[in-house]
Amino acid sequence: MTRDVTAILAAKTVRTFSYGFLGIVLPLHLSDLGLGPAGVGGAVTLMLLGSAVLTWAVRRPAERYGARATLVGLAGLSVIAALLLLATREPWLVVLAAMLGNVAVGTGETGPFLTMEQVVVARAVGAERRTWILSLYNLIGYASAALGALLVGIAVGWQALFIVFLATAVLQALAYRLLPAAIAGPARSATDRALPSGPLIRRMAALFALDSFGGGFVLQSLVAYFLHTRFAVEGSTLGVAFAVAQVLTAISLVLAVPLASRFGLLPTMVVSHLVSNVVLVAIAAAPTAAIAIGLLWIRHLLSQIDVPTRQAYVMAVVEDREREAAASTTNLARTLAQAVSPAVTGWVMQAVALSAPFVLGGGLKMLYDVLLYTTFKDVELRDDAH
């Protein structure tokens, strides 16, 4: 394994460890500070908008200065965010800190770190190993997040967890320092800005946005809020439940490699994702916390098989010089779309039903599966990825 990949995996480990507890703690912390369902939903939307802005902003610096400088800068913002969380009890400053630190409020990432890291991995390994490395990348992230989620049940208070966040942000910056001084794609002149795969990238971005919009209704933070509000599930129990969910998600990432090798990237993405969202809709009808959590676990066992396959697919259908643009555009679309739905979710929970977001989110995500397959089933890969 190359030094580039090792550094990226180390950074992913410490970052997602903190995301594992922050995704649970922040909505509960904001609730303790006086925000209701609509306020928490709006706060999550602002966090995602902050991630979208950072995702949009990193493309040009990455193309000009390389991955190391860009990623170290992003890690520096996480350090500032952790310090701000430690220093304030004002809800709007807590939200600002989460925006600056690109704090993930779901079980996965769609922001600037993912954008840059998947490009580094794509350039560091050949197409024949790309799906495997990206599966390992995501596997490490979910396993680390599972361990982080367990801290919610044993931590003496939110402040202790924010100190852990600060420490992991510093370690993340140090890991990025191990990257070569400049990892960037082939230089493009001002007259060579047109992307041959531009229409393809835009179609992918539009469909990924639909999927992400649906996913925004059922982010981990909002699912935790749902379980806490409807079934009175305590924070310690939520920590264990989501830790198990992260482990099951990690297993789904392991399954992605043999399935993609046998059936291809696109069929693997679509079928696994479709089945997982049928289970998601079923959570809305769960009569007890145990059944709801059980269905959540089944979904997590299937839901992320499409993640490394999707990342490998995006890198495989564009030219090397288009990879920053493809990663940035598709991840930006996902983040922006996901930013809209949490605010709607808060309103839907109050005005319609607490469980309605599961039906809305699952239905939209199933529509995405059908459209994705019909749109891209005849598109050929540019390299030898499978």
Show where each model-derived region lies.
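Structural signature of the two symmetry-related core transmembrane helices
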Residues: A69-L84, P267-A282, G362
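C-terminal membrane-cytosol helix-exit motif in multi-pass small-molecule transporters
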Residues: G148, L166-P186, Y368-F376
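Hydrophobic core of transmembrane alpha-helices in multi-pass small-molecule transporters
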Residues: T13, A81, P91-P112, I291-I305
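Glycine-rich segments within core transmembrane alpha-helices of 12-TM secondary carriers
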Residues: W132-G153, A333-S341
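Residue-level signature of mid-helix packing/kink "hotspots" within the transmembrane helices
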Residues: L48-W56, A145-A146, Q246-V254, T335-A339
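Conserved MFS/SLC helix-loop-helix module at the cytosolic interface between two early adjacent transmembrane helices
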Residues: V53-R89
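Helix-to-loop junctions at the C-terminal end of transmembrane segments
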Residues: V53-G66, S252-L265, M349-Q350
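Helix-loop boundary and gating motifs at the non-cytosolic
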Residues: M1-L49, L200-F208, S212-A243
